[in-house]
Regions:
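Conserved metal-phosphate-binding beta-hairpin within the catalytic cores
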Residues: 10-40
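Single conserved hydrophobic/aromatic residue that forms the stacking wall/gate
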Residues: 1-8, 12-13
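Peripheral (often C-terminal) accessory segments that flank ATP-dependent C-N-forming ligase machineries
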Residues: 60-186
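Short, structured loop/turn "capping" segments at alpha-beta junctions
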Residues: 16, 56-57, 89-90
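Glycine-rich phosphate/pyrophosphate-binding beta-alpha loops
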Residues: 32-46, 87-89, 118-120
C-alpha cells in the first residue's frame, strides 16, 4: 500500500535517503510516516555506529557512485534519550539555563545532539520543546542504556523530563543469552 504513495506521475526521483517511521503492532509493522530526510531522533543512534566518512557518502550519492563506497557499521548498540522542556509537547518555557555540560555543550562519554538549545554569553539555554538527544553506544544494549541515562543524570534544567523506558521492549525481546554478549573489535 505504501507503493501507491511513493510511485506515480507526480513522484520525483531524488538522490537522497528514504526514512520510514514504523510502529510494531500485534498485526505486524505499520508505516506511520516516510520522508526523504533523516528522522529525528532516529538518526542520532545511526550516525555514531557508522564507520567511515558521512561526507564521502553524500558526495558519492551526489556523483551517482555510491556503489564504489565501502560503508561499514560498528558492532554493538546505540541509544538516545531525548530530554524535553517542561510542558512539552503542549506549552513549554524557553530561556531556562542548562547545567552539567562542558563549554562545547557535551558530556564526557556521550554524544549530545542539540535541538532546542541556545548558546549565549558562554551559557546554554533551552530554546524549544525537544532540547537534547543524549546518545551513547556500547557493546551491549544494557551498557548503552546505562551510559545514556548516566549522561542524562548530569544535565540539569528546570522542568526537564525524559522517558525512562527507552530500550525496555528491546531488552525483553533479545534472547537471554545475548544480553551479556560482547562483540570483538577487529
Amino acid at each position: 500500500e505504501i507503493g501507491s504513495g511513493l510511485v506515480g506521475s507526480e513522484m520525483c526521483i531524488r538522490d537522497s535517503c528514504l526514512y520510514f517511521g514504523l510502529m510494531l503492532t500485534p498485526n505486524g509493522p505499520k508505516v506511520i510516516e516516510y520522508n526523504c530526510r533523516f528522522g529525528d531522533p532516529e538518526t542520532q543512534v545511526v550516525l555514531p555506529m557508522l564507520e567511515g566518512d558521512l561526507c564521502e557518502i553524500f558526495e558519492a550519492i551526489y556523483e551517482h557512485r555510491l556503489a564504489d563506497v565501502k560503508i561499514g557499521w560498528k558492532s554493538g548498540y546505540c541509544t538516545c534519550v531525548v530530554m524535553a522542556s517542561g510542558g512539552y509537547p503542549v506549552k513549554y518555557k524557553k530561556g531556562i539555563e542548562m547545567f552539567g555540560m562542558d563549554d562545547k555543550g557535551q558530556v564526557d562519554g556521550a554524544f549530545i545532539y542539540h535541538a532546542g538549545t541556545k548558546y549565549e554569553n558562554g551559557k546554554f539555554y533551552t530554546n524549544g520543546g525537544r532540547v537534547l538527544g543524549v546518545t551513547c553506544n556500547a557493546y551491549t544494549l544494557q551498557g548503552a542504556l546505562d551510559k545514556s541515562y548516566e549522561a542524562v543524570s548530569k544535565i540539569k534544567f528546570e522542568g526537564e523530563h525524559f522517558r525512562k523506558d527507552i530500550g525496555q521492549k528491546a531488552l525483553k525481546a533479545l534472547p537471554k543469552d545475548s544480553l551479556d554478549l560482547e562483540y570483538k573489535q577487529d
